[in-house]
Amino acid sequence: MNSYLEYTSCGDVVAFSPKFCRSDQRNMTLQPYPGSGADHPFMPVGGVPGSVAHQASHQSPALYAPCSLDVAYEPPPPSDYSFLHSSTDYDYYGSNHLVEETGGHIPYGSSVFPGNGSYILNGQLSYRTLGEETQMAQIAQCKEPLEVYPGGNLQSISPSPGTYPKPASPASDTHVSTFDWMKVKRNPPKKSLQSEYGVASPPCTVRTNFTTKQLTELEKEFHFNKYLTRARRIEIANSLQLNDTQVKIWFQNRRMKQKKREREGSLPNSPPSGPASSICVKTPLSKSVHETATLSPSKDV
């Protein structure tokens, strides 16, 4: 089989390569055109031997009009395109043009030449803009290798937990020293109880449950001193593991209890202590003694 397909058009022989057309190409139709062949010169497309061209010039004088070939051809497979902007690193003159500095390459292709050409660039990166999938672009830009699962899905490019150590917080490293003036005891806010009618009841005061030992020591101290100074109150509170306010309130309640018992008569009046004990109390017995003392000198006179 010949390597070229010959077609006669306007006195010239047109040759096509069999790669240009598929096997199911259709026949073309030629229409005659009046005039001389010199008015419409045509250059041969493919290389034709000189003898064949000479024989064609001496054929019948019938002339044909310029025609178009109705030829079905197979489009090239899709390829990658690279739209490169003007820069000093590369130049877009042709498919095999080399740049001054050599380096990485960029794959490209076109509808005419679907081959694997490359531009020589300064660098090691591959640029794919058109006709490339998103996953392939991520793989080209990612520096770290990606793990591929059996299903074909790509794992996220985010680093796995624990890859980079978390910086320690300064609060955990430095120990904040607590001063004495910062140790201020503040009572928590007291919550009011809801009554059955929905009205908030007054807050209840939490009572202190004293132990037997604490009550014994407090009663002993109250027997000797009904009023305490602040220094003595702090000393008793430290010895009994109480605070100053608890001791102060206990002594106030104890004095009120003592006065209540005296008013009710359940307890005799305690003799006052101190200088008040030297005051004389007038009784009927002392009055009779005084009268006898006053009468005795008169008898002597």
From Swiss-Prot:
Compartment(s) where it occurs, according to its Swiss-Prot or TrEMBL record: Nucleus
Any matching Pfam family: Homeodomain
This protein's GO CC annotations: nucleus
KW NAD (keyword) present: no
Disordered, as annotated region: 255-301
Keyword field contains Nucleus: yes
GO terms for MF: DNA-binding transcription factor activity, RNA polymerase II-specific; sequence-specific DNA binding
Family note: Belongs to the Antp homeobox family. Labial subfamily.
PANTHER family documented for this protein: HOMEOBOX PROTEIN HOX-D1, HOMEOBOX PROTEIN ROUGH-RELATED
Protein name: Homeobox protein Hox-D1
